[in-house]
């Protein structure tokens, strides 16, 4: 390859990479203020559903219209250091690595920030490339958003069951009420299904969901409202 052609190719690749990076920054900046009508995880589920979905349900609501019980339940279940870390829980990552070295059952260590980045922007792949891009988006979100916006985004796009996206749709589907009126027990059931909402049954709750929801309620009692206060004070 001629040197001049190689330089042009490298220059073109560099400009393309720079444009891609800038587009990610702009996207995250806009989503600080704009609620997304669609996101990558939901789009992939629509195109390649694990099973047939009769109806897709989703209603966006602001964080203040989501029960504080559910806010605390997902923190207790998924990321108890959410208010303290900067997107990555290094203690949880270290613990998961040690566990996975000696167990056939893999344990994850993704924070709520990482899960939000995955649901918003990423495809369902376990490659190092995907994890690297996910980490980049997580960093951008932590730099540009406050914790309450991350929690609001998570609770509005996470899947609580086949085709059921967000807290409002889940509350109305399972309990016939708005998300603002969810009780601690109901919130813990929803949070218990989050590891695999296509597998774990919320209503009537499977034995696993019953057991895990009881554990979540105990964790909620230990964390207390002070945890949520830290999240909201970070605005």
Curated annotation (Swiss-Prot):
Gene3D superfamilies: Biosynthetic peptidoglycan transglycosylase-like. It catalyses: [GlcNAc-(1->4)-Mur2Ac(oyl-L-Ala-gamma-D-Glu-L-Lys-D-Ala-D-Ala)](n)-di-trans,octa-cis-undecaprenyl diphosphate + beta-D-GlcNAc-(1->4)-Mur2Ac(oyl-L-Ala-gamma-D-Glu-L-Lys-D-Ala-D-Ala)-di-trans,octa-cis-undecaprenyl diphosphate = [GlcNAc-(1->4)-Mur2Ac(oyl-L-Ala-gamma-D-Glu-L-Lys-D-Ala-D-Ala)](n+1)-di-trans,octa-cis-undecaprenyl diphosphate + di-trans,octa-cis-undecaprenyl diphosphate + H(+). GO terms for cellular component: peptidoglycan-based cell wall; plasma membrane. It is a single-pass membrane protein. It is found in: Cell inner membrane. One of its GO terms (molecular function) is pentosyltransferase activity. Keywords: Cell inner membrane, Cell membrane, Cell shape, Cell wall biogenesis/degradation, Glycosyltransferase, Membrane, Peptidoglycan synthesis, Transferase, Transmembrane, Transmembrane helix. Its EC number is 2.4.99.28. InterPro entries: Glyco_trans_51, Lysozyme-like_dom_sf, PBP_transglycosylase, Pep_trsgly. Its main location: membrane. It comes from the Bacteria. SUPFAM superfamilies: Lysozyme-like. GO terms for biological process: cell wall organization; peptidoglycan biosynthetic process; regulation of cell shape. Pathway: Cell wall biogenesis; peptidoglycan biosynthesis. HAMAP family: PGT_MtgA (MF_00766). Peptidoglycan polymerase that catalyzes glycan chain elongation from lipid-linked precursors. Belongs to the glycosyltransferase 51 family. This is Biosynthetic peptidoglycan transglycosylase. It comes from Aeromonas hydrophila subsp. hydrophila (strain ATCC 7966 / DSM 30187 / BCRC 13018 / CCUG 14551 / JCM 1027 / KCTC 2358 / NCIMB 9240 / NCTC 8049). The gene is mtgA.
């Amino acid at each position: 390859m001629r040197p001049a052609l190689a330089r042009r190719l490298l220059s073109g690749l560099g400009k393309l990479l720079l444009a891609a990076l800038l587009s990610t920054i702009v996207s995250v900046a806009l989503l600080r203020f704009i609620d997304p009508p669609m996101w990558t995880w939901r789009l992939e589920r629509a195109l390649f559903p694990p099973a047939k979905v009769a109806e897709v349900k989703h209603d966006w609501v602001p964080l203040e219209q989501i029960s504080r019980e559910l806010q605390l339940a997902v923190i207790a279940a998924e990321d108890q250091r959410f208010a303290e870390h900067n997107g990555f829980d290094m203690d949880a990552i270290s613990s998961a690595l040690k566990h996975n070295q000696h167990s056939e059952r893999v344990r994850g260590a993704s924070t709520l920030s990482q899960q939000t980045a995955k649901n918003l922007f990423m495809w369902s792949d376990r490659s190092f490339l995907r994890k690297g891009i996910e980490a980049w988006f997580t960093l951008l979100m932590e730099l540009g958003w406050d914790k309450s916006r991350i929690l609001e985004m998570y609770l509005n796009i996470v899947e609580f069951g086949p085709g059921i996206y967000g807290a409002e749709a889940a509350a109305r589907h399972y309990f016939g009420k708005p998300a603002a009126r969810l009780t601690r027990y109901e919130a813990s059931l929803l949070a218990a299904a989050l590891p695999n909402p296509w597998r774990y049954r919320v209503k009537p709750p499977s034995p696993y969901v019953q057991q895990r929801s009881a554990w979540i309620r105990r964790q909620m009692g230990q964390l207390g409202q002070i945890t949520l206060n830290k999240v909201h004070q970070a605005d």
